[in-house]
Amino acid sequence: MSLKHFIQITKPGIIFGNVLSVAGGFFLASKGHVDLAIFLAAMIGTSLVVASGCVFNNCIDRDIDLKMERTKNRVLVQGLISLEVALVYASILGVAGVALLYYVANPLAALFAVIGFVIYVGFYSLYLKRKSVHGTLVGSLSGAMPPVIGYVAVSNSFDMAALTLLVMFSLWQMPHSYAIAIFRFNDYLAASIPVLPVKRGIRVAKKHILLYILAFLVATLMLTFSGYAGMSYLAVAAAMGMYWLYMAWTGYKAVDDTVWARKLFVFSIFTITALSVMMSVDFKAPTELLLTYAH
């Protein structure tokens, strides 16, 4: 049991991805007026809650992880940290994260963190991941909470921009997750996890991927059409979304589904990273918003 093991079970890669989206939502709402204390609270608080969820997920998934090539060497599977210690660790992380959001940002930010946590740990990890083909859809809501937390930490209200972020990031999760399930197909099959590609076949999953990316593309453009983001954001969102859609379409002619799915997965990360960056720098200032609505 070492510091390295405690870091590993929080899934740092997932935390990093979520932190980027928190920043995107935060700067979109800040419109150039940054409160450093709230920014740090949103970033650190969300990171702690996400880390807590990941540790709880590791605790819950020990039996599944043992059956999957990708996860069979995880810390808890190998017994490098005891279950009891991991549960206490996860609880401390979660409480600390929610408290930081509640007291330094605002209760609304803390509420969305709790909602995301409950969906991920309670609904997805404990039950739906193992029992339902719709587990990915429900789980996608938890993955969409970080940008919303970042946004409401500043705005202290759930407005159209926050709703758009929720829809955008939920829709993004679906093709992203299905791509993983395709190139890790044998792992999911071995662990009897009823993800769409395993349960209904890869061809059906390809159709769903195409439709979700199309819906995602439309949702991303709404930030500009609703007056929250600028034209540079729109250009990047349209270009990235359309190319991702094209990549999905090529899946119907793919010679190797594993190679295709891995490329789709990698580009999904580039896409959501680019959009998080663009909404951070190409927001509409309050005066610009007034002009937008005046017209």
Curated annotation (Swiss-Prot):
GO terms for cellular component: plasma membrane. One of its GO terms (biological process) is heme O biosynthetic process. It is found in: Cell inner membrane. The keyword Cell inner membrane applies. It holds the Pfam family UbiA. Its EC number is 2.5.1.141. PROSITE patterns: UBIA. It is a multi-pass membrane protein. Gene3D superfamilies: UbiA prenyltransferase. The chain crosses the membrane at residues 9-29, 36-56, 85-105, 108-128, 135-155, 163-183, 209-229, 230-250, 263-283. CDD domains: PT_UbiA_Cox10 (cd13957). Keywords: Cell inner membrane, Cell membrane, Heme biosynthesis, Membrane, Transferase, Transmembrane, Transmembrane helix. Pathway: Porphyrin-containing compound metabolism; heme O biosynthesis; heme O from protoheme: step 1/1. It catalyses: heme b + (2E,6E)-farnesyl diphosphate + H2O = Fe(II)-heme o + diphosphate. The keyword Cell inner membrane applies. One of its GO terms (molecular function) is protoheme IX farnesyltransferase activity. Belongs to the UbiA prenyltransferase family. Protoheme IX farnesyltransferase subfamily. Converts heme B (protoheme IX) to heme O by substitution of the vinyl group on carbon 2 of heme B porphyrin ring with a hydroxyethyl farnesyl side group. PANTHER family: PROTOHEME IX FARNESYLTRANSFERASE, MITOCHONDRIAL (PTHR43448:SF2). Carbon 2 of the heme B porphyrin ring is defined according to the Fischer nomenclature. This is Protoheme IX farnesyltransferase 2. The lineage of its organism: Bacteria, Pseudomonadati, Pseudomonadota, Gammaproteobacteria, Pseudomonadales.
